[in-house]
Amino acid sequence: MSKKNDWLDFDQLAEDKVRDALKPPSMYKVMLMNDDYTPMEFVIDVLQKFFSYDVERATQLMLTVHYRGKAICGIFTAEVAETKVAMVNEYARENEHPLLCTLEKA
């Protein structure tokens, strides 16, 4: 006579659980959007302050925002991306600029 739980493969269940636990986290692109009012110097400041770019790379990204309408500032896990978006948007509002920082799934 067979055991009651022959139909369950406990080893496979354990492997599936471990595999699920080891999946890499979802990643998100943090982007700056162009507007007609935020000074270029402020965008450079944001890129240096919140994304740790040197002045040269920050200037390149600022020009991408200016000419293409948006630029990816970095790719992060959900929690980090959400925090950076919130911090940049709050900083822009505190300085009375309409600069918009957004995120989207990478």
Curated annotation (Swiss-Prot):
<comment type="similarity">
    <text>Belongs to the ClpS family.</text>
</comment>
<protein>
    <recommendedName>
        <fullName>ATP-dependent Clp protease adapter protein ClpS</fullName>
    </recommendedName>
</protein>
<dbReference type="InterPro" id="IPR022935">
    <property type="entry name" value="ClpS"/>
</dbReference>
<dbReference type="InterPro" id="IPR003769">
    <property type="entry name" value="ClpS_core"/>
</dbReference>
<comment type="function">
    <text>Involved in the modulation of the specificity of the ClpAP-mediated ATP-dependent protein degradation.</text>
</comment>
<dbReference type="Pfam" id="PF02617">
    <property type="entry name" value="ClpS"/>
</dbReference>
<comment type="subunit">
    <text>Binds to the N-terminal domain of the chaperone ClpA.</text>
</comment>
<dbReference type="GO" id="GO:0006508">
    <property type="term" value="P:proteolysis"/>
</dbReference>
<dbReference type="GO" id="GO:0030163">
    <property type="term" value="P:protein catabolic process"/>
</dbReference>
<dbReference type="InterPro" id="IPR014719">
    <property type="entry name" value="Ribosomal_bL12_C/ClpS-like"/>
</dbReference>
